[in-house]
């Protein structure tokens, strides 16, 4: 694991807010806490559950503060607002920071799936309102953001899976990122619909993500 140097004088980090629970956003948290154990970790329920599981691997029990999309928290000099976004992991948020110096909007990772399986849309109305109020710095994370158009909706894979489950003569082997709960949910639903047995060979993080989302 390679992480940036975070040991500047006195480790001046006052709190850490994670927009979602993917490894590239939470993987360095235990190393940060080893420098300064009292840093409060802020995030949604699912995100913090994954953060706590990550910290448990390092025998660290963090101090956490749970937020939901729409919440506004005062974190030091920053008024911090959390906005719902859709992503390939549940419970993702964007973060808006307001201070006397200006306003920063950080989207975190997001996609514009208009028919998400979990019903959680990227809240463009909320983002538009923030834009109308004035944003001094807009920081957006999204793979292939420079390509025009939309990401194919997650529901598009449903008919493909259904066709395979309906016509299977042997076993179906499915691999998935542990955190992609919606992607795991689809084959489980078709397995039940067609009364097929299932054998799950979970990796470490698949077990933790599944337990967290249950």
Predicted regions and their residues:
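His/Asp/Glu-rich metal-coordinating catalytic cores
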Residues: 1-17, 22-214
């Amino acid at each position: 694991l390679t992480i940036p140097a975070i040991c500047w004088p006195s480790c001046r980090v006052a709190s850490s807010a994670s927009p979602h629970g993917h490894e590239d956003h939470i993987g360095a948290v235990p190393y940060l806490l080893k420098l300064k154990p009292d840093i409060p970790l802020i995030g949604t329920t699912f995100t913090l559950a994954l953060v706590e599981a990550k910290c448990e691997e390092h025998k660290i029990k963090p101090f956490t503060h749970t937020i939901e999309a729409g919440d506004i928290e005062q974190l030091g000099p920053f008024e911090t607002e959390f906005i719902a976004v859709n992503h390939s992991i549940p419970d993702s948020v964007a973060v808006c920071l307001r201070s006397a110096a200006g306003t920063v909007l950080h989207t975190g990772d997001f996609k514009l799936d208009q028919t998400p399986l979990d019903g959680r849309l990227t809240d463009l109305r909320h983002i538009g309102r923030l834009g109308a109020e004035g944003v001094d710095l807009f920081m957006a994370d999204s793979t292939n953001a420079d390509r025009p158009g939309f990401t194919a909706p997650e529901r598009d894979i449903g008919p493909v899976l259904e066709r395979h489950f309906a016509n299977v003569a042997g076993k179906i082997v499915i691999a998935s990122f542990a955190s992609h709960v919606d992607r795991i949910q689809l084959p489980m639903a078709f397995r039940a619909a067609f009364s097929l047995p299932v054998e799950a060979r979970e990796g470490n993080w698949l077990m933790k993500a599944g337990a967290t989302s249950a």
